[in-house]
Amino acid sequence: MAEKDIDKLLSLTDSKYRLSVVIAKRALQLRSGAPSVLPVEQRVRTRNLVTQAMRELATGKLTVGTGLMDENRFHQDYVRQKQAQLQAQLNAERERERD
């Protein structure tokens, strides 16, 4: 990221340490399957999730303290989604076996 973007990110938090924690948490959420909040045309063309998290924060799509889910709630939502997907797959397989 450009130096001006990093300066902007630093201005969003009270310390560089808090900024690094916020970015790390968002990168973990992205790795766990959370969708990007950026429109497709603004997404970073990289697999580096830290860069993507920084871009989301820099563009104002996330704000410190309001745009990040509580870790436990995010994990619970993610587990529920995965369970629903697996149940749907299981139901589809059972339907095919009946036919």
From Swiss-Prot:
Q: What are the protein's UniProt keywords?
A: DNA-directed RNA polymerase, Nucleotidyltransferase, Transcription, Transferase
Highest taxon of source: Bacteria
Query: A GO molecular-function term, please?
Result: DNA-directed RNA polymerase activity
Give any Gene Ontology cellular component: DNA-directed RNA polymerase complex
**Keyword match Transmembrane helix:** no
What's its top-level EC category? Answer: transferase
Pfam families (UniProt xref): RNA_pol_Rpb6
Q: Where are the transmembrane segments?
A: none
Q: Does the keyword Transcription apply?
A: yes
A biological process (GO) annotation for this entry? Answer: DNA-templated transcription
Q: Which InterPro entries match?
A: DNA-dir_RNA_pol_omega, Pol_omega/Rpo6/RPB6, RPB6/omega-like_sf
Which reaction is recorded as catalysed by this protein?
Answer: RNA(n) + a ribonucleoside 5'-triphosphate = RNA(n+1) + diphosphate
Q: Give the protein family.
A: Belongs to the RNA polymerase subunit omega family.
Briefly state the protein's biological role.
Promotes RNA polymerase assembly. Latches the N- and C-terminal regions of the beta' subunit thereby facilitating its interaction with the beta and alpha subunits.
Q: What is this protein called?
A: DNA-directed RNA polymerase subunit omega
The organism is: Deinococcus geothermalis (strain DSM 11300 / CIP 105573 / AG-3a)
